[in-house]
Amino acid sequence: MIFLIFSILFLHLANCDYTPDWESLDNRPLPSWYDDSKFGIFCHWGLYSVPAFRSEWMWWYWKGTQPDKDVVNFVDKNYKPGTTYADFAKDFTAEYFNANQFAETVKTSGARYFVFTSKHHEGFTMWPSRTSWNWNSMDIGPKRDIVGELRDAFKKTDVHFGLYFSQFEWFHPMFLDDGKFNTTFYPEQVSYPQMIDIVTKYNPEVVWSDGEWDKSDDYWKAKEFLAWLYNSSPVKDQVVVNDRWGTGTMGKHGGFMTYSDHYDPGKLLEKKWENCMTLDKHSWGNRRDMKASEVNTAYEIIEQLARTIACNGNLLLNVGPNMHGQIPAIFEDRLEEIGRFVNITSEAIFGTRPWIHQNDTSASNVWYTSKYSSGKKPLKNLYQNVYNFQLEEHTIVYAWILDTSHEQFELKSVKTTKNTTATILGTDVVLTGFEESDSMIILSSKIDWKKLPRRDIIVLKIEKAASYLRNPLMSTNEHHVQ
């Protein structure tokens, strides 16, 4: 079986557009749907949701090279002597799991894509993997194809479906032996066939690799996999991937960059990137002792979304369901609150590009996004796909004012003309009467605060601001366009 898989792959690679080397693979254009989508929901769910203690790394903290005393004590106190991690599987019932409800919750959040953990570092697969016998959601625990049910549910929506996949497994005997004997049995017989399996069975539009850092991209056969994915897979035209494909690849190779978890550069990056973060500030997986104060507020997430998309990133926000298959109510409440505002301000988010400024040069906590009114690029240059120029007749600027406590807001990055207007999204309020000026001033007294969808965030749609050129990637110099 393994020989057949590799034979098919090498036959495909013989006549293909992309070859298994980074020079070729890194030249593949990123499908536009991903950049346009801006906001996604991540979901970490696996066997670790049964003990639900510390984080999804619980097994490693319990039985790894340096056991955590608190985790060891937790198991000793709450489980019978001799308990193993595999014993948790019988309690992983998922009896309340409803894939359609998951899809509806994601849809309510306003997110445009969804990424689910098909397998985390524990090795338990959430689909019936042939290379993970009796250690998958069909053979034990829920006895359901969780990935398949989610794929079918998201097919009914316009939300893109993606899969996270951990390359390594902490305690898999083959992986441990490979480290001892410099062999490659684990990728050849386990992880590589699993990647092919999830793509061919479930057609994910995102393949989100992780757990790669301990071995090289050659060990994981990452380049061979990506060449097949881009050339011959059933999702070759629309799939996107991240940058975690082996030691030293993060931030260098792949589709979009992640650089690290919770990455927030605060400046424009030329390469498309993603900020993956959690609603629970301390864990990706479900945590039984999580406190309400440890959950990010809707404001904090919206603020992070604005900062991220202003700098050419996407935001991937994680939730962790419990062992019964329920997304915690506090997470659902947060997603609903976020979704209300995202849907009201959607034109300032989806399909936008960074502007010539990412945040304001003077006003505190103001971030910018932009788009062209015609939907077409009126000027072309090397960075036309990274940011939009400021052209009075073409550019719409969205100013995300994230600190509304001032009596006036002076936006020094926006130069006004007599034709400039500013609409407060979510209201029918249009501010006019601007003069030719090197900054835009909005008086708090001119705002009908009762009409705002939120009083702690204002999003302005600015049209016909004065033209001027600035390359935010190369210099701070600017000049007016006549």
UniProtKB/Swiss-Prot annotation:
Pfam families: Alpha_L_fucos. Glycans are attached at N182, N343, N359, N419. It is an enzyme of class 3 (hydrolase). The keyword Hydrolase applies. GO terms for biological process: fucose metabolic process; glycoside catabolic process. Its EC number is 3.2.1.51. GO terms for molecular function: alpha-L-fucosidase activity. Residues 1-16 form the signal peptide. It catalyses: an alpha-L-fucoside + H2O = L-fucose + an alcohol. One of its GO terms (cellular component) is lysosome. Keywords: Glycoprotein, Glycosidase, Hydrolase, Signal. SMART domains: Alpha_L_fucos (SM00812). It comes from the Eukaryota. The record marks C276 as: May be important for catalysis. Belongs to the glycosyl hydrolase 29 family. Alpha-L-fucosidase is responsible for hydrolyzing the alpha-1,6-linked fucose joined to the reducing-end N-acetylglucosamine of the carbohydrate moieties of glycoproteins. This is Putative alpha-L-fucosidase. It comes from Caenorhabditis elegans. The lineage of its organism: Eukaryota, Metazoa, Ecdysozoa, Nematoda, Chromadorea.
